[in-house]
Structure formats: C-alpha cells, structure tokens
Amino acid sequence: PVTRIEKTAGGWALTTPSGIVETRYIINAAGISAQAVHDMAAPHKFTIQPTRGEYYLLDKSEGSRVHHVIFQCPNENGKGVLVAPTVHGNLIVGPNADPVEGDDTACTAAGLAFVSAAARRSVPNIRFSESIRNFAGVRANVDTGDFVIGEAEGAPGFIDLAGMKSPGLSSAPAVAREAVKILEAHGDLPAPKADYRDGRTRVRFKELPPEEKARLIA
C-alpha cells in the first residue's frame, strides 16, 4: 500500500513498503481507499463509507421469473434491491447496503434475509431454496452524491476517479476518456502505440469441455 505521497519537481513520489515510486501523474482509482490516497496529496474533499452489498445467485430453474431488471426505488445508500436475469440464464437478487469497516465481504444471515424479503416485494414467488451461490462486494459510498472525477485542487497531476458505485463498471470507458482528457491538457502525453494488439486470452469457462474445466479448477 501507499503510505506517503509527496510533490516533487517532476511530479510525485509515492512511498510504499517496497520503496519509492516516482511518476509525473497519479490516477487515484483506489476504490474504498481513494479518500485516504487523496488526503495524502491534497486537502480533504470527500469521505468514503465502505458499504457492503450481499447477493443471491439462483439456479437456472428460477431464471425465467423475470425477463428484464426489476428495480425498486433507490435511497441515499444506493440503488436498492433488484431482481435480474443473467446472461447465462440464472437469476441474481440483491444487494443490501450495510456500512462496514474496510473490505469486509462476509455474507450474513441478517443481510441475506433482508435481501430476500425486499426482493419478494417485487417478485413474490421467488424460490430462494434454489440458491446456488451467495456473495458480497464492498462499494465506495461517497458523501458527494456522485462520482469524484477530476484533478484535485492544489495538486496538479493528481487525478481522482473515486466514489464509483453501482454504475461504475458500465461507465468505466467514459470515465477513462475523461481521465485521458485531463492528462492531455498537460500536453505531454506519449503518442498512442499504433501497432498495439491486445493478446490476452479470453477463457469462456462455460464453453470448455469437462477435462479442460477440471484442469483449470485443479
């Protein structure tokens, strides 16, 4: 983890347990730690409350209960409990919104009971006995009410991308373009690599033969 950030003549110096890293720019996309990282480099601007959301993933036998995402009215903590079909034919239900300390992704009986009761207000006949998986994630609930995107006041070259909650994944490409615009305004970005090729292999586990699935799991 980063333990200290200092401004230098050429940009920034970040102290870590592995040593000091020097860079011209910092993009603060540290999730629930973004407030702590920001406060090392610039005056305090926002507060993040880590908020756990718990989910049910139900068997495909429940996947046809709904044919599009069913939202309830959101509140100050987030989007509320939704019921949605997945691309693989399952049904996903959740989340709740419980303030936690740090990255606490434990599922709780109370949290899952809240999720199931809230979901039944939208879709009364869900069979939660068909649950095949429960999981939880922690989102960065920020007190500004919206994403924090921009160069920090009094800290040129330090860019916050913080407070990303429920739509963060969907908006990631647009957020990245905003970050690039800020960097371009400084006028010294390297040119894009014209010959860049994404060579990463994409494994579609569902489509693999049984022996290949077993090899990857082992």
Residue ranges and their predicted role:
Residues 78-80, 87-88, 99, 103-217:
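C-terminal catalytic lobe of FAD-dependent flavoproteins
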Residues 5-94, 98-108, 117, 123-126, ...:
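Flavin-dependent oxidoreductases
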Residues 1-2:
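A conserved beta-strand/loop element that lines the FAD pocket in flavoprotein oxidoreductases
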